Amino acid sequence: MKVPQLRKKSEIKSCHNVTWEDNYSWIHQKDILEVLKDKNKLNPEVREYLEQENSFAEFHLKDTKNLQKKLFNEIKGRIKLDDESLPYIDHSYEYWTKTTAKGNYSIKLRKKINTNLVEEIWNGDKEKEKLNVEYFGVGDLEVSHNDKYLAYSLDTKGSEYYTIFIRDIITKEIITKKITDTSGSITFSIDDKYIFYSKLDENHRARKIFRHKIGNFSDEDELIFEEKSEAFTVSIGLSSDEKYYFISTSDHNTSEQYYFKVNEEKPTPKLVIKRERGILYSINSWDKKFYNHTNKNAEDFKIDISNSLENQDWQPFVAAKDEVLIGGCIFLNNWIIRSETSNALDKLFVRNISQNIEEELVFTDEAVSVPNISLRQKDKNTDEIYVGYSSPKTPSRVYQYNLSNKSKKLVKEQEIPSGHNPDDYIVERVDYKSHDGRIVPLTITRHKKTKIDGSANLLLYGYGSYGNSMSPGFSSTRLSLIDRNIIWATAHIRGGMEKGMRWWKEGKLTNKKNTFEDYIYAAKYLIDNNYSSKGKLIGMGGSAGGLLMGAVVNKVPN
């Protein structure tokens, strides 16, 4: 079968005093966002070429049909299809979700506390069937504070333009029928008379915040905030103490926030701190104080505290640390919980407010793991939370943990129906030197029977973009490779934030080559230390990681 050929049409382009020939710029459609909404608007010649590429790939993979089926069944066999989440107590109800073997979408359930009557308030498969659509993506599912309304957003075309609906949970009546072209995010007002949402512009950017009165037509919605810069996007959220709404506007490097009180009849957002190029900040309020998570004079962030936003008197709460990324806070009446990331490992810390004592939460002796935390209930007057962790060899485990007496109880463990023994696997964290001497973390997972003599095949995964960190958590799909003596290695290369903001900055823009070199030196380390050998390495990277793959195979094809 011949390799598909795309028509060439020469066009000379220039930028920054560099001129080049581009044979394929004709592919770009100016109305590409319209194509996302309606796939029939795709250039027919491009569609035909893509179909040829699909046929070409299928032709060359035809001998692997049985293997594909076997792998599919293996991976499916590790997924518990009939499953339920842990409950979350919100006012007078417990809410949770479940999945079933027969369905493709989740079901949201609730029951009144101290009763056994379970209500189904959302069923994705039934909703998709009612709409009779091919594509069905759920953006947000939010229940009102009074437990009366369910607001949800749907994308039925794969365009990531979401339409919002609001339904009366008891009567099933659609109260608000359609708010189109939104980002999908929904926030209820405290009195449950309104929702706040962001509208997408023609360039798919959220730059406007609207207030919608439940039951009204969307053309009556009130614009309460508009971002003038095309480079920034906006969002809105409720503070932890439920006394303020904060509107956040930001690009990747700079942010700004506005606030208004929840009881304002006509919301008038007030500026918190004027934007300053390169400065990120995020304000939250709790117990009559305001907390500012910011990188101002703190490359890897810090947390400051103030008694007022009108007369700001910021004082240190959590100091900055070199190459330690300081995360935000979760607030309870007696406790403040926060996170840190350093050397590609996450940590959780809990502070006793009355004693002003902080300590790390540790739930496993595994050297490489990913901790997580979630609240059991909306009421903050509690000492109990959910704390969990996973690792490259250990599926997720969640404990109900009492912060006061430090007792814990295992309440949910990710089940692998086909069976899984963590002791069959070995996880290593090693460091290697890159081209400029910087030390890069590398997480390696292998079966205990796999030999370290250069004979094993090895998949080296990399991303290194947008400040996204590759946390070393559990993945059941990887086991199909690892069980076949293929070593899985994740290089925590620059461009992510595994070692703080500087790690990101050293792998972006004019420093992007560091991302590529870090990956190449990871491959060299793995070969030099007999994890694999030349000709046995598999490179993997998707999305922005695709740029990485293109760069490294051209730079060092051997």
Locate each region found by the language model:
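Cap/lid segment of the alpha/beta-hydrolase catalytic domain
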Residues: 126-141, 153-159, 173, 364, ...
